[in-house]
Regions:
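Charged, amphipathic alpha-helical linker segments immediately N-terminal to NTP-binding catalytic cores
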Residues: 1-39, 245-253
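Generic recognition of stable, solvent-exposed alpha-helical segments in well-folded globular domains
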Residues: 13, 17-21, 68-72, 90, ...
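Conserved NTP phosphate-binding and transfer environment spanning the P-loop NTPase/kinase superfamily
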Residues: 140-284
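Secondary-structure transition/capping motifs at alpha-helix termini
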Residues: 32-33, 80-88
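Conserved nucleotide-sensing/catalytic segment adjacent to the nucleotide-binding pocket
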Residues: 85-155
Length: 284
């Protein structure tokens, strides 16, 4: 049994502290069970385009720290949904875990059915359009958040085989040398990027500027680093061996002027890659 506590002080009254504490305990338990915890967002999508019989589907996991553009990219998928997506199921909005099954595939799970999203990063007016099912936290502050139900417990616990394992890069500009979607060529290259956990902090925490955290996840992995390193090595080796696309997605959320367009273009770039399986045209 694992036990944790939050001091009964006003400065610890922020909902996120309680949420992250619970998730930290969850991550530790997952590592003890042989699963790799992740700080990221995962979605199962099915595309339109005459694919109902053949099935163009993809399970996408975006890993990254706070303000990396994970939830915002999922929000962009939602906005693009009417045109390109037949079905979209959010499996994990913030935390989850990965296990290697008997066939060597990566199976990913979520942890919670709700999303804890910054108001400033949502499409204008969206949160208030969901007011009947939303809980809005500290709307007068910079780090104002809204809690929205986004997944079912069945999807959270089902376990989906991964097709794309991506790091959400919010700090690099896009150019010919740095494409929106960059695929890695080896486990070592991928581990270097994921382990560094770089993110351009937006002032939504106590950090600002380019900061680093071990695997973009301070909630368990640093405290059990030896176990985590072993699990991460096995997971990334299995990813390349089983054909999972591993890389980084440049969301540009941390670059001024790209708060909305960055995640949207990242979502479009990812959709274009998935749509190459069929003749579906997606504008840049």
């Amino acid at each position: 049994m694992l036990v944790a506590a939050v001091p009964l002080e006003d400065r610890f009254g922020y909902f996120g502290y309680l949420k992250k504490m619970t998730l930290t305990l969850h991550n530790v338990i997952m590592m003890k069970r042989g699963r790799l915890p992740f700080h990221g967002a995962m979605v199962h999508i099915s595309l339109k385009g005459g694919f109902v019989k053949t099935g163009i589907e993809a399970n996408i996991l975006l890993i990254g720290d706070t303000a990396a553009g994970k939830s915002e990219t999922l929000e962009a998928f939602r906005i693009l949904g009417e045109t390109f997506i037949r079905e979209m199921r959010i499996v994990a909005d913030d935390m989850g875990s990965i296990e290697i099954d008997e066939a060597g595939r990566l199976i990913a799970y979520g942890t919670e059915i709700g999303a804890f999203i910054r108001l400033d990063d949502l499409q204008q007016g969206y949160a208030f359009g969901q007011i009947d099912r939303a809980i809005i936290m500290s709307p007068q502050k910079v780090n104002a958040r809204v809690v929205l139900p986004v997944a079912t417990i069945e999807d959270v616990l089902k376990g989906y085989p991964l097709d794309y394992l991506l790091y959400a890069n919010n700090y690099e500009e896009v150019d010919p040398e740095h494409p929106i979607l960059e695929q890695f060529t080896s486990p070592a290259q991928a581990l270097n990027v994921f382990r560094e956990g770089a993110v351009m902090a937006k002032g939504t925490t106590t950090s600002t500027g380019l900061v680093h955290s071990y695997f973009a996840n301070i909630f368990g992995p640093p405290q059990y680093k030896e176990s985590h390193e072993d699990l991460a090595g096995k997971v990334f080796e299995a990813a390349f061996e089983s054909g999972v696309k591993v890389g980084q997605l440049r969301t540009r959320l941390g670059i001024p002027g790209y708060e909305a367009s960055g995640p949207e273009k990242a979502a479009r770039a990812l959709l274009r890659v998935i749509a190459t399986l069929r003749d579906i045209k997606i504008a840049p």
